[in-house]
Amino acid sequence: MGSGAGELGRAERLPVLFLFLLSLFCPALCEQIRYRIPEEMPKGSVVGNLATDLGFSVQELPTRKLRVSSEKPYFTVSAESGELLVSSRLDREEICGKKPACALEFEAVAENPLNFYHVNVEIEDINDHTPKFTQNSFELQISESAQPGTRFILGSAHDADIGSNTLQNYQLSPSDHFSLINKEKSDGSKYPEMVLKTPLDREKQKSYHLTLTALDFGAPPLSSTAQIHVLVTDANDNAPVFSQDIYRVSLSENVYPGTTVLQVTATDQDEGVNAEITFSFSEASQITQFDLNSNTGEITVLNTLDFEEVKEYSIVLEARDGGGMIAQCTVEVEVIDENDNAPEVIFQSLPNLIMEDAELGTHIALLKVRDKDSRHNGEVTCKLEGDVPFKILTSSRNTYKLVTDAVLDREQNPEYNITVTARDRGKPPLSSSSSITLHIGDVNDNAPVFSQSSYIVHVAENNPPGASISQVSASDPDLGPNGQVSYCIIASDLEQRELSSYVSISAESGVVFAQRAFDHEQLRAFELTLQARDQGSPALSANVSLRVLVDDRNDNAPRVLYPALGPDGSALFDMVPRAAEPGYLVTKVVAVDADSGHNAWLSYHVLQASEPGLFSLGLRTGEVRTARALGDRDAVRQRLLVAVRDGGQPPLSATATLHLVFADSLQEVLPDITDRPDPSDLEAELQFYLVVALALISVLFLVAMILAIALRLRRSSSPASWSCFQPGLCVKSESVVPPNYSEGTLPYSYNLCVAHTGKTEFNFLKCNEQLSSGQDILCGDSSGALFPLCNSSELTSHQQAPPNTDWRFSQAQRPGTSGSQNGDDTGTWPNNQFDTEMLQAMILASASEAADGSSTLGGGAGTMGLSARYGPQFTLQHVPDYRQNVYIPGSNATLTNAAGKRDGKAPAGGNGNKKKSGKKEKK
């Protein structure tokens, strides 16, 4: 009695236990998650929260490792939120074609514990395709004897969308003779038929032009048009008639190209040409798998068929008689499936290794089998090949788990080749196999070993940032993470804060990258200590040294130190004695190169010379010497364009322009420089005369005379010429400075700026301070000022110091070709009118710049900015009375100079340059 009650109690508990277990596994095995989304959703769009729909919390996501298992990567699961995201383009027409329902089915895989979940995503159609005709225009030939009510089939349009988004209606442009009827085929597609409303008369009108419009009912609706050209012909009142409106035939997918599908027939009650029938595919049928004999109507297979791609074909045929009348029929071809596809085994997840102490039943891999065939040809079973300590468990439909079935021992078998064979139920059955190699993991007992004990690498400077400069490699005989080596930099002879800005190393590959462009001139070598570390626990490591040597490249062009450039970038002039003998040292081009080795070897070359053969240039020294004596036909001013090249490959170069003037004193050079007209003034003067000439021609002479007198009176009454006597002593017009020149050889150099003589207003200033010694004649940066600015409190326009009759240049102050050359120790103030005017123009131009406050020249007040060598005694107090010597350029005022009248001789030509023999050279 008691045993019976106990058995009865156990019997009652078994269904309860079964229902409990079923409630646990049924959500994973039975439920299917469904979503519905429109096609063409952007990549990254959210389909739904898969984790929430499966009952997972956000905290479980890292351990459950929820992911998608599908053949094509249409979707992915966000690891952070568990949302199902679109990962590739969803084109419903490409995925499902014309199917009314389109859905993507796949499995969602979750681990710990391992489960599969079926997900179904329905793709809704959107109106993203416009109806399109196969051609832009159609031509119809209609007999004039055609009766009203005769129908003519027109070319159809195609719309890849479905439902209301697909082609729904055709419209015909208004016509007195034609109307349009929308027809529907057996497959539901629409096609237009044009109906003749009134009889045609070819003698009245030979042709008609109509517009056919195809529309869909999408939102917004889309449409396209085609032109219909109707030609009216003579009578052909009977159209061809097919023996059947619809032909149906079944074909095996394995039939060979050339196999006859069927033969259609059509008759025409007309006679002669109007009864000759030709067959063709309709323009709406884009058929590439079949061929049609236009005369016999025989349809044959053109290309191989595939049930897995297309299961049936709907072909529209046309029969056209000689009069242009057309009849249509439909041929429906059903493709029969054959067992021509072997099953496939796909491993969804593959472990890198499994530890040898893994427990029985440990999950190793997930695999899925599939067969493209249908029915029993697509039913698949799978099994393991060979004697291996594993087994396969069925998880869900066509999904299996590979788990351990025995204790593993790495010392006996460090790895296993696991082969899974899938076989279908077709006749004959087809099968396929897939293999994986499973490694058995061990403990971390080997440290990484570098392939070399140390590394030395050469890197050319100016390398691109991010370039690879070296690669180190270390091997570890361990398996899995114990043998995975990562690299890092642990020490260097560079400062720690600068290390990351110089080099970095790839932790995976050991490739050392330059983070910046190296400069041989700043850093020639450095050393790194690299470490290779495995991923074991505890981790083992090894160190190695890497020495990087930075090689020099020709990346620095030569830099010309002498001659220096003026503010406008041109070279200053050098003065050469007129009697200079061949070999006379004129000047020397001095340049440097920041590179080293051959890249810093410099050579000097003449690129251009105004008088070839007059000068020679030292290839390595850069010395410019006279190659011959100055001839009578040689110009006084010469120009040399010199190139300085280094020895690099390719060589870099710099250029310098030398302006050489043959003269025995500075006074000879000044008139030649100052008298040159400004090109811009010449152009302005030319334009002025052209305007005056045109005015004289176009305007009456009397009016021109009145305007000229008025302009003359206005100019004579302008007080601008007295602007220099304003309290501020400011110049009204900015002085114009011609190009800079330098006079001198190696021991000395003159820098001279001369104000333009055509438009400058002169202000006479008196400066009481003396010029400080040791300052050279320099040119301003941009204003063209020559002389230093005097204190405004010391300027006056009413007093002028008397001339100093004992004004001299001392021997140390006299210009010459070298410091050792001798000359006359006496020098007088210029006594002729030209030199006096020239000197005053220089002084007044300097005063004008000083009044503007823009002069940047050195020198004390009253010294004209001359250096100590030429300037200490040359002060403004030696300038003759400006009321006697002033000369305003552009005027015809008579110039007076008491000294010039008193002594008509030219000033003494002091500092005449000597030849090498020591004799004086006459002008």
UniProtKB/Swiss-Prot annotation:
Residue spans crossing the bilayer: 690-710
Signal found in the keyword field: yes
One Pfam family, short name: Cadherin
Segments for region (Disordered): 797-832, 893-923
Membrane topology listed for this record: Single-pass type I membrane protein
Basic residues bias locations: 913-923
A GO biological process held by the record: cell adhesion
Extracellular side stretches: 31-689
Localization of this protein: Cell membrane
Keywords carried by this UniProt record: Calcium, Cell adhesion, Cell membrane, Glycoprotein, Membrane, Repeat, Signal, Transmembrane, Transmembrane helix
Gene Ontology terms, MF aspect: calcium ion binding
Cadherin domain: residues covered: 31-133, 134-242, 243-345, 346-450, 451-560, 568-673
UniProt KW Metal-binding keyword: no
Segments on the Cytoplasmic face: 711-923
Database matches in PROSITE patterns: CADHERIN_1, CADHERIN_2
Origin: domain of life: Eukaryota
Gene Ontology CC terms: plasma membrane
Endpoints of the signal sequence: 1-30
Entry-linked InterPro entries: Cadherin-like_dom, Cadherin-like_sf, Cadherin_C, Cadherin_CBD, Cadherin_CS, Cadherin_N, Protocadherin/Cadherin-CA
Glycosylated residues, chain numbering: N417, N543
PANTHER family from the UniProt entry: CADHERIN-87A, PROTOCADHERIN GAMMA-B4
Task performed by this protein: Potential calcium-dependent cell-adhesion protein. May be involved in the establishment and maintenance of specific neuronal connections in the brain.
Protein name, UniProt field: Protocadherin gamma-B4
Organism: Pan troglodytes
